Amino acid sequence: MAQVAVTTQPTDEPSDGRMVVTFLMSALESMCKELAKSKAEVACIAVYETDVYVVGTERGCAFVNARQDLQKDFAQHCQGEGLPEEKPLCLGNGEACPGEAQLLRRAVQDHFCLCYRKALGTTAMVPVPYEQMLQDEAAVVVRGLPEGLAFQHPDNYSLATLKWILENKAGISFAVKRPFLGAESQLGGLGMVTDAGRPTVPPNDSYGPVSVKTEPMEDSGTSPRAAAMLIKTESEDPNYNVCNVQGSQHFSASSDVTGMELPSEESTRMVALETNEDPETEVKMEGNASPSNLVNSAAGVEDLRIIQVTVADNEKERLSGLEKIKQLREQVNDLFSRKFGEAIGVDFPVKVPYRKITFNPGCVVIDGMPPGVVFKAPGYLEISSMRRILDAADFIKFTVIRPLPGLELSNVGKRKIDQEGRVFQEKWERAYFFVEVQNIPTCLICKQSVSVSKEYNLRRHYQTNHSRHYDQYSGQAREEKLRELKRGLRKYLLGASEIVCPEQPFPNASPPTNSAVQPAEEVAGSLWEKLRQKIRSFVAYSIAIDEITDINDTTQLAIFIRGVDDNFDVSEELLDTVPMTGAKSGNEIFLRVEKSLKKFSIDWSKLVSVASTGTPAMMDANSGLVTKLRARAASCCKGADLKSVRCIIHPEWLCAQKLRMGHVMDVVVDSVNWICSRGLNHGDFTTLLYELDSQYGSLLYHTALKWLGRGLVLRRFFESLEEIDSFMSSRGKPVPQLSSRDWILDLAFLVDMTTHLNTLDASLQGHSQIVTQMYDFIRAFLAKLCLWETHLARNNLAHFPTLKSVSRSESDGLNYIPKIVELKAEFQRRLSDFKSCESELTLFSSPFSTTIDSVREELQMEVIDLQCNTVLRTKYDKVGVPDFYKHLWSSYPKYRSHCARMLSMFSSTHICEQLFSILKLSKKEAQWGAALQVAT
C-alpha cells in the first residue's frame, strides 16, 4: 500500500482547501497502515463549501483530486441525502435559491418512489405514475398528507409543502387498490433513472450485514461527519469490483459504471449483490457514531466521517450463489426455448429471439405468465420473478400470431446438431449417471436418451428425476453404483435387440443371471469387433450406399456390406452411418466411404460391386462415386472390374414422370385429402358409403409424395367414383373431371398400371434377394410391357380390366401405347447394368445349361467338368441355387470364386430403406443405435 506524500497536494488551492486535503491525506496514511494486510484500495472524500476533495490509492499509486467520477458520484449522493444541519442558501430577497428547491423536489420524488415500491411489494425502484394516479384517484391511495392537501407531482408543491413532506415522511404511505397496466414492466432492474437523469438504487439493497465503528482524528481533534469511501478488493482476477458505499445501507453505482455495459462476470456479480446471495460485506466506522461526539475540526471545514470497509473474500460462498443464479437463469431460458419451439411446431428447444419479440409486440403472444411478471430475457429478470415463472411453467404458452420481421420461422426448426461440435465428457458419467452409446447420451438409471450432449440437459434430467435417490452415493460408493448401472444397461440393450429383431438375437449373448456380464460401454465395441472378424473371413463382398434426410434435416449416408465366406454363408451387415454436411459431391461421398472401409481394414481387392441410387453424385462419369471406387479398386488389384448396380427397388418412382398422368393424380389427391382432412365431411362420407352399401367404408388418405400406395388409393377412388361426385357436389365443391369420359378412361388405365407396378414392387422387396432373382423379375416385367404394347395396338384390354370396364370404343386402347413405349424404354435403360454381366449371371444361376462358348476362358475347363458330373447335377436339381454352392467341391476353385462374387452382389438398396425405417422406430422408442446392426 503506497503512502501519500504531502507534495502531491495541488498548490493552486486556497488555504482552507489545502487544509482539507492535508487532513484527508493524514487520515488516508493511517488507514493504509490498517488495511495493508487486506490489499484494499482506499479513497477518502470530503465536501468543503461547493468543492469536493478526493485522495486515495489505486494499484499502489496515490492520487489527489484525480478521480472525477468519485467527485461527481459523491456530489449526487450529497444532493440525494441532503445535509440536515446545512443552512439553505438564500437569495438577497429572502427566497430560497433554485438549487434548494430542486433538491427538495428530488428528495420528495425519491420518497414517493420508495412508498410506491413498498406498495407494489417489490425490491426494485418503480417510477410513480403521477398522471394515471391523478386520473384514477381510487387506484392508489396516498396516506399521511395533511388535510386539504391533494397528491400531485412534487414540481407542483410549494417549498413549504415540500419541507413539511420531508419532515413528516415517516407517516406517508401508498396503498395500491388497482395496479396500473405496464407498471410491472419496470421491475427487476438494478436501479432506475429519474426525470432529472440521476441514477438511484433502492435504499434497502445492501451488500449484507454491516457493522459500523467511528474513529476520531487524533491529529485534528475532530470527528469528521459527511463522507463516503470507495474500496476495492483484489482477487486473482485482475478485474476488481467497484462499489461506492454511501452511508450504512445506501449504495449507488458510480457514473463510469452505469454509463457502460458491464462484462458478463461483473454483471453476474451485480445480480448476486442485488439478491443478497453475495459474499458478506463488513463496514466499520472507527470511534463513536453518536452525533454528540461530532465536533468541528477547523474553521469552515465540515465534519468528516471516516468509514472502513472490509469485504469478506469467501470464494466458495460467492461461487455457490452465482452458480444458483446461473442455473435458475438457464432453467428459465430452457423453458422459454421449449415453449417457443412448441409454438413454431418442432419438438425440441429453439432459441428465443427476445429482442424481436420485445420490439415487435403482437407478433408473439405469451400467455400464462405470473401476475406482475413481464416477459423478457432471463438476464433481465429478478430472482423472485424467475422462480415464479418456473412454478407456472405448465401454464405458460407461446403463440405466434404473425411472423417476426427478419426471422424465417420455417428455418428455425432446422437444427443441425452434428454441426454444433458437442462432445460427451467422461466426468458426466459419475456426476449424472449418463453414458454415450453411438454418440447419444443415455441415462443409466431410466435408459432415456438426450438428443444433445449438453451438460445442462444431463444435469436437468438427473436433478429432476433421480437426484433425490442417487445423491446419497458419493466417493467409492458412487463408483460402485456406476459400474452396477453399466452392467444393467447391457441387459437392457440385449432386450432392445430382441424387440427390434427377435429372430436375430445378439450373438453369444450371456444370460442375465451370468455374473460375468460385459460392461455396458463395451457392448457396441464388441459388436463392431465381431463384424471386423466376419469381414476378414469374406472371400468377396459388395457394398450398398443410399442417403436420406432425417427429421433433423441432416443427410445420413448408410453403407451396407454383403459378403460371402468360404462356406458360402451370406451376411448382410450395416457397416456405417455417416452424417453428410456441406457439399454432397461424389468426391465427398467417396472420402466418407473410403474412411469407413479403412476403419474396418477391408481388402479393396475383394470388392465386387456397388449398389447406389443412380444420382449424378453416384454415377457421374468424371467425378462420381462409382468412378472413384473403380479407380481405387483397380489400383489395389490389377484387372479388377467393379460392377455398378442402380437401384430398381421403386420402379413406380421411375414411371411417375414417364406415364405423365399428373392431371389424374392431382384431382384424386385433392379430392381424397379434402374428404379425409375434415372430420365432419369424412364422417358424412362414411355414412353415405354405408347407406349405398359400397364396397369400401372410407378412403385412404394420400399425398402426392409416394407412388407406393397409389394403386390402392386409385382403385378405391375409382370404385367409389359416383358416390364421391355426388357427395362433393352436395357440399358445394363440384369436380367437373369426375364426369368427364376421357378423364375417367385415364383414371382406369392408371389404376391398372399402378396395380401391375405394385405387384412387381412386392416381388422386388424380398429379404436377401439374389441378384439373379431380381434380374429375372425385371426381365419378366419387360416382357409383359412388350405384350401389353401388342395387345393395346389391337385394342385387346385383357390385362387392363379396369380400363376395359369403362371402354366404349375400339380405339380407347390405342391412346395408351405411347405411355407403354416410354415405360419400356426406361426399364431397358435400367437393365443395362445387368446386361453387361448377363453371361456371368447365367453361369451362376444355370451352370448345367449354359453354353461353353459364353464362359470366360479361365473357367471353361472347370465348367465342362461340372456339367459332366452327375452327382453334382443331382444335388443341383435337389437343392437349387444358392444352396448348391455349399456342396460344390473344392476341386473347382475358380468357379467357386466366381459364384462367391455373384452371390455377394446387392441387387438394390432395399436394405438401406429397412435401416431408415428402424432409425425412425429407434427415435420413438429410445432404442440405441448398435441394435440396428443386428436388425439388418
Curated annotation (Swiss-Prot):
Tissue specificity annotation: Ubiquitous.
InterPro entries: GTF2I, GTF2I-like_rpt_sf, GTF2IRD2, SPIN-DOC_Znf-C2H2
Main localization category: nucleus
Encoding gene, per UniProt annotation: Gtf2ird2
Record family assignment: Belongs to the TFII-I family.
A molecular function (GO) term: DNA binding
Protein name per its UniProtKB record: General transcription factor II-I repeat domain-containing protein 2
Gene Ontology cellular-component terms listed: nucleus
Region spans: Disordered: 199-222
Any one Gene Ontology BP term: transition between fast and slow fiber
Coiled-coil ranges (or none): none
